[in-house]
């Protein structure tokens, strides 16, 4: 028995295939999904979704959204997603360093919108860098 996984962003369908196991980056931590999993809906955090198929793991970088598990079908709706194998790791690393610098420049601004945006940029950059290194 397998799962059917769909990862959808507003501008594209990133993944639509079967999987043996899925690990989701939920807002409460990593969540493993196997065939026969109980039905549920969970919030998705910035992070890397891992997909096991035929003994091989694939990675998908995600920004926030939601996931629904229902009858061995998993649908992930996120603001942005990209397959790890399509991410240039050098560019992802440079963006991660730039995001770290941007956040450090805003560290004394309390909860200002600039600091919050810098933290979101850093979270996205971390997810893309991790996904680029996972494949």
UniProtKB/Swiss-Prot annotation:
Listed transmembrane segments: none
Membrane topology: Peripheral membrane protein
This protein's record includes keyword Magnesium: no
Keyword entries, A-Z: ATP synthesis, CF(1), Hydrogen ion transport, Ion transport, Membrane, Thylakoid, Transport
Key word Transport present: yes
Top-rank taxon, per record: Bacteria
One Gene Ontology CC term in the entry: proton-transporting ATP synthase complex
Pfam families: ATP-synt_DE (PF00401), ATP-synt_DE_N (PF02823)
Cellular location(s): Cellular thylakoid membrane
Listed GO MF terms: ATP binding; proton-transporting ATP synthase activity, rotational mechanism
Complex formation: F-type ATPases have 2 components, CF(1) - the catalytic core - and CF(0) - the membrane proton channel. CF(1) has five subunits: alpha(3), beta(3), gamma(1), delta(1), epsilon(1). CF(0) has three main subunits: a, b and c.
Functional summary from the UniProt entry: Produces ATP from ADP in the presence of a proton gradient across the membrane.
Family listed: Belongs to the ATPase epsilon chain family.
Name of the molecule in the record: ATP synthase epsilon chain
Organism: Prochlorococcus marinus (strain NATL1A)
């Amino acid at each position: 028995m397998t799962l059917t996984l769909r990862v959808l962003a507003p501008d594209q369908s990133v993944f639509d295939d079967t999987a043996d196991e899925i690990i989701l980056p939920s807002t409460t931590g990593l969540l493993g999904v196997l065939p026969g999993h109980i039905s549920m809906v969970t919030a998705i955090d910035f992070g890397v979704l891992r997909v096991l198929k035929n003994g091989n793991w694939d990675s998908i970088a995600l920004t926030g959204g939601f996931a629904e598990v229902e009858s061995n079908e998993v649908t992930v709706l996120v603001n942005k997603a990209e397959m790890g194998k399509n991410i240039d790791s050098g560019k992802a690393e440079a963006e991660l360093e730039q995001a770290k610098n941007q956040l450090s420049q805003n560290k004394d601004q309390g909860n200002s919108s600039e600091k919050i945006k810098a933290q979101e940029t850093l979270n996205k950059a971390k997810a893309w860098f991790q996904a680029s290194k996972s494949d």
